[in-house]
Amino acid sequence: MATQGSKEKKGYPELKEVIKTTCKIKVGPGKETLTEGNCLWALKTLDFIFEDIKTEPWTLTKMYTVWEKLKQVTPEETSKREFASLQATLACIMCSQMGMRPETVQAARGIISMKEGLHEKQEDKEKKVEQLYPNLEKHREVYPIVNLQAGGRSWKAVESVTFQQLQTVAMQHGLVSEDFERQLAYYATTWTSKDILEVLAMMPGNRAQKELIQGKLNEEAERWVRQNPPGPNVLTVDQIMGVGQTNQQASQANMDQARQLCLQWVITALRSVRHMSHRPGNPMLIKQKNSESYEDFIARLLEAIDTEPVTDPIKTYLKVTLSFTNASTDCQKQMDRVLGTRVQQASVEEKMQACRDVGSEGFKMQLLAQALRPPRKEGKQGVQKCYYCGKPGHLARQCRQGIICHHCGKRGHMQKDCRQKKGNPTSQQGNSRRGPRVVPSAPPML
């Protein structure tokens, strides 16, 4: 390592861990990462450009100052590519200094760009805080955990604007998306462990994904216990997760390492679930096909869940949840009809029993009959009445009220429907029903 740097010391000892973390950031989609030489080149170049602050140690405050000055520099046409590399490397070092873990150089640039976009909003917020705390330190690493003049720190709740912005990103891009990870990594550097976990729990998202995230956090906790035996100066899992602490206690300086570990665990869990979601054979992507029976769908789903590297309780939860949410529409309706309100908690066996007839010929005929069944006419009009006589049960063209039978002379029916005609088939037609014809003649002689 060259003998040049802050305060003329060998290298940059204050950035030893930061450079080590920065070397894990990928340059692009491949496996190539930044090297220690890349970081030293960027730092030495910046010290050469801005000689007025060369002797100052590389704190986060100096990085912000250099970043603002670097934006005002206009590079020559032949050195634009090197200038872009210089900015990108500085962005990665700044993210590592703030405790963030971006996967790629582009992600680091996105985090710094997002911070620039929020700079105007932060200025108004800082003015209000400075009015309340005139002796507030300029270093903003742990804000809103504010350092007080009398000693100690005070805790400030997460603002509603920040919470709503995180909610919007989670709804638009997903709970385990890279956009949500960047937003959370930016804001959560100033939160307590309790703040981080509470905000994550209140975010919108798939319940199965939340269970997987919780499972990954439990795995990180178990790994911490194995690698760090209990001791006087060893953090416990409860301290890291903020269990049994008030916000005031969690905001103190002795909990800084616990907050950083909690945020690191959450970021690791989000990335693990995201990689799991995009991996072939992911159970959450297995859905029932149109021509597939429910039994075949369940067989594929259970096989995929059993191969997942998660704990048994999470596997059980995924089986119960995905067996309903990933089923076809017909099966979901059938389960709702049979199981009712307990459909979400019902076992896989109960759901298979409820859907055993879905897809059969009898089930298809039942659906067809329901579709062809005429709707019941129920309304204010009621039963239709005859416009001629006003009575219900027939139309005006079928009304018999004004009809006279030409056989019996009675009203209400036609001659073809006359019962008297049917009962006496030998009766004469025409006027014979009136009796014998009277022939006029003179009276008898007395």
From Swiss-Prot:
Question: Where in the chain are the CCHC-type zinc fingers?
Answer: 384-401, 403-420
Q: Where is this region: Disordered?
A: 415-446
Q: Where is the composition biased (Polar residues)?
A: 423-432
Q: Which UniProt keywords apply?
A: Capsid protein, Host-virus interaction, Metal-binding, Repeat, Viral budding, Viral budding via the host ESCRT complexes, Viral release from host cell, Virion, Zinc, Zinc-finger
> What does the PTM comment state?
Specific enzymatic cleavages in vivo yield mature proteins.
Q: Which SMART domains match?
A: ZnF_C2HC (SM00343)
Q: Which PROSITE patterns match?
A: ZF_CCHC
Keyword Metal-binding attached? yes
**Its domain of life?**
Viruses
* Pfam families in UniProt: Gag_p24, Gag_p24_C, zf-CCHC
Motif PTAP/PSAP motif mapped to chain: 440-443
Which InterPro entries does this chain map to? Gag_p24_C, Matrix_HIV/RSV_N, Primate_lentivir_Gag_pol-like, Retrov_capsid_C, Retrov_capsid_N, Znf_CCHC, Znf_CCHC_sf
Q: Name one GO molecular function term.
A: zinc ion binding
Single GO cellular component annotation? viral capsid
Any GO BP: viral budding via host ESCRT complex
**Family according to the record:** Belongs to the Ovine/caprine lentivirus group gag polyprotein family.
Q: What is known of its domains?
A: Late-budding domains (L domains) are short sequence motifs essential for viral particle budding. They recruit proteins of the host ESCRT machinery (Endosomal Sorting Complex Required for Transport) or ESCRT-associated proteins. Nucleocapsid protein p14 contains one L domain: a PTAP/PSAP motif, which interacts with the UEV domain of TSG101.
Q: What PANTHER family has UniProt attached to this entry?
A: ENDOGENOUS RETROVIRUS GROUP K MEMBER 24 GAG POLYPROTEIN-RELATED, IGE-BINDING PROTEIN
Its protein name is: Gag polyprotein
Gene source species: Ovine maedi visna related virus (strain South Africa)
Lineage, broadest ranks: Viruses, Riboviria, Pararnavirae, Artverviricota, Revtraviricetes
Originating gene? gag
